Design a protein with these regions (language model features):
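Conserved beta-strand elements of the Class I
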Residues: 123-124, 285
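N-terminal ligand-binding/catalytic initiation module
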Residues: 1-101, 109, 119, 265, ...
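Short helix-loop-beta connector
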Residues: 115-122, 144, 206-207
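NAD(P)-binding Rossmann-fold cofactor-contacting core
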Residues: 141-168
């Protein structure tokens, strides 16, 4: 029967350290040819857009997709459907808002592990929305962070985020009134916004910083200006195929001949040791995250296996 797993049940199962482990494995397996990822497809109508991401892991014997619809509603519902690739049977349907937030954060955690300085201790957060939770938790999972600065256009939102997350993580956090002040002296910078104009400027960056940019997964979005990207000695993407379609931070520079796709490694290539993530302490490094279905599939497989083991979720009265 098909297991149905709700958001709150996913949250019971999936921790950030486990999500980081799973996403790292997914990216490594794809790079070494043992997993397949298909870039996001979009079907647009006047009222909104249906978005679908597909991936497969022959090693896990799983294939599946994530689907969601973005329209005028402020609420977007994400679902992962996971199939057994040997039997062809639908194994599970998972409510995937929480899962998506965790795996997106985990990708930044993996990038931080391989690209940030090992002694990174100060984290700057640009953005304090729902996705910021995963970004914060992931960096704290891979580095000994002792200070977090948070910027939001609504400073009260930033303060509320600090209050909530400092108690959960046991880390000193405070809201900051400007982006420039937020990133000054930071070792790692997380940018997770829906900005259409650059939020992070190159003039604010300092040697040795690492940046995770996870919000510009559309050609109409920009989180970094051209100067910020050009100051980075190493710019990595999760998927070149996907970034070519939708990376709003990089496409303008590519179009002007200021960047070359062939010079931008994928994070999986760094994980596999084919390319260094950082060559010295003074380099500024950047990870551009678009999101990949293979991250969803690896994470979903773990969630489903754990749910069955612990009798979490319900079996739908359909299928064999």
């Amino acid at each position: 029967m098909i297991r149905y797993i709700k958001e709150k049940e996913v949250a019971q199962i999936l921790t950030m350290p486990k999500a980081v482990e799973l996403v790292e494995a997914a990216l490594r397996e794809r790079t070494t040819g043992r997993a397949i990822d298909i870039p996001r497809s979009r079907t647009r109508i006047p009222a909104g857009t249906l978005q679908m991401m597909q991936a497969a892991s022959p090693a896990l014997q799983r294939i599946g997709f994530k689907v969601y619809y973005t329209g005028s509603s402020k609420i977007t519902s994400y679902y992962v459907q996971l199939f057994d690739s040997e039997s062809g049977k639908l194994e599970a349907i998972i409510e995937a808002n929480y899962l998506g937030m965790m795996r997106t954060g985990a990708a930044s955690g993996v990038a931080t592990r391989y690209m940030a300085r090992e002694d990174a201790a100060v984290l700057a957060m640009i953005g304090a929305g729902k996705q910021a939770v995963g970004q914060l938790e992931a960096v704290c999972a891979v580095r000994k962070i002792n200070e977090v600065r948070v910027y939001s256009r609504d400073i009260e939102k930033a303060r509320a985020f600090c209050t909530k997350m400092s108690g959960k993580l046991g880390v000193k956090m405070h809201a900051v009134a400007s982006i420039a002040e937020t990133v000054r002296g930071a070792d790692v910078i997380n940018v997770i916004t829906k900005a259409s104009a650059p939020a992070l400027l190159g003039e604010w960056l300092a040697p040795g910083q690492h940046i995770n940019a996870a919000g510009a997964n559309s050609f109409v979005r920009r989180e970094l200006d051209a100067a910020a990207v050009q100051r980075c000695a190493r710019v990595a993407v999760d998927s070149r195929a996907t970034a070519r379609i939708e990376c709003g931070d990089l496409l303008p520079l590519i179009d002007k001949g200021l960047l070359d796709w062939d010079a931008l490694p994928e994070l999986g290539e760094i994980i596999a040791g084919r390319v260094p993530g950082r060559e010295n302490r003074d380099e500024i490094t950047l990870f551009e995250s678009q999101g990949m279905a293979i991250e969803d599939i690896y994470t979903a497989k773990y969630v489903v296996d754990t749910a069955r083991e612990k009798n979490i979720g319900i079996d739908l009265p359909i299928g064999d």
